[in-house]
């Protein structure tokens, strides 16, 4: 392995993109925003193609943005760092407000460095549920459009993790291994890059199927279910290439990412299966 060190990719980018006065702009949060923006723009186009009004669509971004942000943050704090965030009052404040209580008693703006993808998905569900209830729209249509767009957002989220040198893989001697200098000097699987590439491929695949079959030739819930099934099945298996993120995972048969992926895979399979029934019911109504 030592002889091959020169062939590995040495990865040590500065996670900070820029400083704006007291504020720190990080690649991680920037990638999140780019991913959400691209998803929003694509969904806006889908809404127009499907003849859905701008008045109905405009509020959706805010529901999803805050749902993903709050859910992702709570998911990280509760599932991955409960011993820090749930033990002291000032740490509890840091769960939702991107500030850190300094030893001298002052507060420092830090930006969100910890957002869990599973928590973001659950938060997105809550945001969409509130949106559909308040705007009186078909939830399955919204979820299908989300399923078509989510892959591109997930791609940029994982690129943000890569820029942060976090969620690193296990030690390996594959020729494309990364040496994450901020962690240690061992070549490791670039798990973030694996996921980013896979999610981008899933995005292209789902978009291709949608363009071929459209929204009406399949039952509602199909694209949403396909997205959940593809992404979280891959996520389940790619976890085997990653280092554990929290100590208590070492004693578990599966890590937290795998445990949280299982209900989402089941939901995805159910959504695909039940979409056939909804398609048949729709055809009967049309006759």
Residue locations for each model-derived region?
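A feature for loop-to-transmembrane-helix boundaries and adjacent hydrophobic helices
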Residues: 1-287
């Amino acid at each position: 392995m030592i002889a091959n060190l020169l062939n590995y990719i040495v990865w040590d980018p500065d996670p900070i993109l820029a400083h704006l006065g007291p504020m720190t702009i990080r690649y991680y949060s920037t990638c999140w925003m780019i991913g959400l923006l691209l998803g929003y723009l694509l969904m806006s186009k889908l809404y127009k193609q499907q003849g859905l009004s701008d008045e109905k669509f405009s509020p959706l971004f805010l529901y999803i943005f805050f749902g993903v942000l709050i859910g992702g943050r709570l998911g990280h704090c509760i599932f991955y760092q409960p011993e820090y965030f749930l033990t002291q009052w000032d740490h509890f404040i840091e769960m939702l407000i991107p500030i850190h209580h300094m030893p001298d008693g002052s507060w420092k703006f830090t930006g969100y460095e910890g957002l869990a993808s599973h928590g973001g998905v659950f938060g997105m569900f809550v945001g969409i549920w509130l949106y559909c209830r308040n705007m009186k729209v078909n939830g399955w249509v919204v979820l299908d459009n989300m399923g078509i767009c989510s892959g591109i957002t997930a791609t940029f989220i994982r690129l943000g993790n890569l820029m942060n040198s976090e969620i690193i893989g296990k030690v390996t001697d594959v020729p494309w291994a990364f040496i994450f200098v901020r962690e240690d000097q061992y070549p490791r699987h670039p798990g973030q890059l694996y996921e980013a590439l896979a999610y981008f491929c899933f995005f292209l695949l789902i978009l291709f199927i949608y363009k071929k079959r459209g929204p009406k030739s399949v039952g509602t819930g199909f694209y949403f279910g396909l997205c959940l099934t593809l992404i979280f099945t891959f996520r389940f298996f790619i976890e085997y290439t990653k280092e554990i993120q929290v100590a208590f995972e070492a004693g578990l048969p599966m890590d937290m990412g795998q445990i949280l992926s299982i209900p989402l895979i089941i939901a995805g399979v159910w959504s695909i299966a039940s979409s056939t029934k909804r398609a048949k019911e729709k055809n009967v109504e049309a006759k």
